[in-house]
UniProtKB/Swiss-Prot annotation:
Stretch list, region Disordered: 251-291
Annotated compartments: Secreted
Catalytic activity reported: Endohydrolysis of (1->4)-beta-D-xylosidic linkages in xylans
Domain of life the protein comes from: Eukaryota
Family in the record: Belongs to the glycosyl hydrolase 11 (cellulase G) family.
pH dependence statement: Optimum pH is 6.0.
Residues spanning the signal sequence: 1-22
Pathway: Glycan degradation; xylan degradation
Protein source organism: Neocallimastix patriciarum
One GO term describing the cellular component: extracellular region
Protein name: Endo-1,4-beta-xylanase S20
Enzyme Commission no: 3.2.1.8
Molecular-function GO terms, alphabetical: cellulose binding; endo-1,4-beta-xylanase activity
Amino acid sequence: MLRKLVTGALAAALLLSGQSNAQNACQQTQQLSGGRTINNKNETGNGNGNYKYEIWRDGNGGSLTLYPKDAAFKASWNNSGDFLGRVGLTFNKPAATNLGGDLIANYNYKKSGSDGGTYSYIGIYGWMDNPQIEYYVVDDWMHNRGAPGGSYMGSQKGTITVDGGTYKVWSGQRTGASKWGTSTFTQIFSIRTSPRQCGSINVSEHFRQWQKLGLRLGGLMEAQLLAESGGGSGYVDFTYATITIGGSSSNASAPSNNNNNNNNNNDNNGNWNNWNNNNNNNNNNNNNNNNNNNNQGGGNCAAIWGQCGGSGYNGPKCCKQGSCKQINQWYSQCQ
């Protein structure tokens, strides 16, 4: 995801806790109140304890309420284009799988609204360095189009089982805006096949499973609970949220490699072409159609709902159907 306001500050101390039980998180339903609200601006800063926060919006309305308890927050948006709210920990680039204990996120939230038919993520998000990696663990989303997935995420590397759930793992290369300006970096996604609104994410176990699939990791810069939407109006309200180090590792099955070419395409009966969004326009090395053909008659032009432009994008810039509409500076779509 494109982030202009992210800091790489080191957490002053790593939090230790044994609260890694999903059942406990799902029992934390009391509505929170109070705290501080940031309205209609892009900002990063310090939250409770060692937690850091960020709100980022690409126009129009959005707010982030920081509750006076742990990493709990409420993110709200109103036709704000790309919007995100996130709270979590930052690190000084230790090896992702050598943190002195497992990195565990516990959460419970309510949600309402939609992503405007584009894209949305709820889960864990962060960056690594050397190599540059943007990563997601997605447990839920704001739409009813099925689990995210498709060639815009790169290629499917396999499936893993973590915290009692099955995740499809995708990875690809992207060139565009990043924490380092404009650069080429790797994206890694764990997409849960059955969404949930409470539980525990053993982030460290995802890291280990990614390595078993042959993915190279870097030094950890951040791990934060995320609510992101590419449009529409709605909110995600975390009534309980902690990110700790020191929990025990969850039981995880060995990853299953996936070399089926069909999995590199839309795996939701065609419903996911319109999820090819501004944050995940991978310049995928497996996509031979990524060229600068401007032939408006078709040929290598993008299909309906496909990407046709944006900062850092090197693919087709014409549409087989409809016309190319700019969504924001990073993403234009055939509509």
